[in-house]
Amino acid sequence: TGLAIKGRRADVDTGRPGPRVAILGELDALIVPQHPFADATTHAAHACGHHAALNAMLGCAEVLTRPEVLSQLSGSLAFIATPSEECQNQPYIASLIEAGKLQLFGGKSELIAEGVFDDIDVAMMLHAGGANYTPSGFNGFVMKRLVFHGKSAHAGANPDKGVNAISMMRPALTLMDAQRDTFRDEAHVRLHGYIPEGGEAVNVVPDRAVFTLQVRAASPEAIQDASDKVDRCVKAVAIAFGGETEVQNIFGFMPLIAYDELDDVHQRNVQAIAPGAPFTRGIYRPSSTDMGDVSMIIPSLHGYFRGFAGTAHTDDFLVADAQQAYVDSAKMLAMDAIDLLWGDASCGRKIAALKCPMNKQTYLEKMRGFSSTLTFGKD
């Protein structure tokens, strides 16, 4: 218990040799006050369907731990409930990292660092959606906190004595927008953020402004390239205004890669449970998930199941078909695990032997290497 502060893990061993398969479910909700099922106090709502995906894990566990099923399997199972996939309260997470309570930004990333996945050979999870499919990949991302330090002054009497931090921020954002043509299409680069700080009073030249930015891309190299370009834009305005800028980098998630052999297993089971229903492969998602981190070091499945309607992360994302959302999803995940561990677990052994892009050490080195603080101006 207490994995990545809020995570949980339970293990079941068949008593016969074979791979250890992890079945994952995500715990966190989103702050969506207008969602019809939002909590009255916290405004949290399952507007990404994690409750249904966690239900799939629990339903899968209920089936696989039955003696008549477990006796036909080899190897072992780890059921892992993972926190903090949505990365919502970024300052809070950053404070936990600074206090030494966490090492990395995402829940699964932290579990990797803690060694929770050290004994896992294959990892699988499903996610709620409006269709059955497996993506070809996801973007990874780095979180950037851009702090613009100017100089306060009376905004009416003598603004010439100040350095307006908002005026520093504006051309920095324009320069970032001008960089978009330099991003390769296949890199799927996304730059997006918001302004949490921008002054305290209308008649004071703001001496501090903050822009929180997420840089997403399809590979660690593309993330680094886009991140470096943002840094140069921020450096340029520090020089131009004679102020100071600070860039705080915390690496978020790695890109997700798909394993065709594991997707093959899942596709067969989806089509057995929902014959005639559409199933799609190869959809690239420019969003991000910390399952990408797991996929870097362990053969992984991140499939989607139907049963929801509306737009994820909004107030209209709701269960449209309870059978599909809660029952079929659990069946799919259970059948995937059974296929991997059935008999002598030969299928699972083959998938466990697939080559991954990184080992744990390389992964941690890259994650920590991205995290840094840079300052520009006033040398």
Task: Show which residues each predicted segment covers.
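Short coil/turn connectors at secondary-structure junctions
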Residues: 4, 16-21, 42, 71-77, ...
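Zn-dependent metallopeptidase/amidohydrolase metal-coordination segment
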Residues: 279-377
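Midchain, well-structured core segments that form catalytic/ion-binding scaffolds
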Residues: 112, 117-264, 268-270, 283-292
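Phosphate-handling active-site elements
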Residues: 61-80, 176-187, 342-348
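Acidic/histidine-rich catalytic neighborhood of metal-dependent amide-processing enzymes
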Residues: 55-137
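Short beta-strand segments
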Residues: 22-26, 78-82, 124-127, 147-149, ...
